């Protein structure tokens, strides 16, 4: 997996596919079984979380219940011994970006679910770094709130000019947020690249299913040569094949948004 500066890189995969474990390895919270972790071109595989200087927004709200919103957001900056002026400037910036200025004196038990998540995101973004890891931060929220927070996250990343590594099992989130995407399947990244590239020309069935709203339908097919062209036979009928596809069994992905309704022809299903 390779994340470039300025990316909104989304790790997309089914629930329990290992997304959180992968992110925790990047953060230094879990050891890697093999391979190395590089941040900013430096090998940090043996470094602990504090030495990696990565901002983190976990899946759960994980707020201190006895501290105000203000103190929750200031906490990572106090750990990093940030100066008072810079702390206040950062607090003002993240609160303005996430529209939570009026919540600063409230405790978590006085907040709605959306306000708690905004506070958790603000605390993660208060870390003095240009690289942030967000582990499925919108899971469990209703659609309208998720839609609003998706807009907030895109605007925040753009305004700060930072890099986001984000995980989700929700294909719509992947499509709305990612500039680059890595599809996690069978214990590894099965495919990665620019979102448009992976969506338009997927090289793995896992990509077809992870990126789509709804997910693509997969059917078995068989490619055969017919004169100078190639045809693929499926239970849905025959279709001409373009590109460099070898004759033989294949898996055909059908996206519902690419299906057109027309007049039935002979042999159609």
Residue map of PLM features:
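ABC ATPase nucleotide-binding domains
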Residues: 53, 66-206
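Glycine/charge-rich catalytic "coupling/switch" loops of P-loop NTPases
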Residues: 200, 234-269
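Helix-to-loop junction immediately C-terminal to a conserved catalytic motif
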Residues: 27
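The feature captures the beta-strand-to-loop junction immediately N-terminal to the Walker
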Residues: 12-14
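ABC ATPase nucleotide-binding domain helices that frame the ATP-binding cleft
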Residues: 20-23, 118-119
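Conserved coupling/switch loops of ABC nucleotide-binding domains, chiefly the family-specific signature
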Residues: 33-36, 186
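Conserved ABC transporter NBD signature motif
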Residues: 35-43
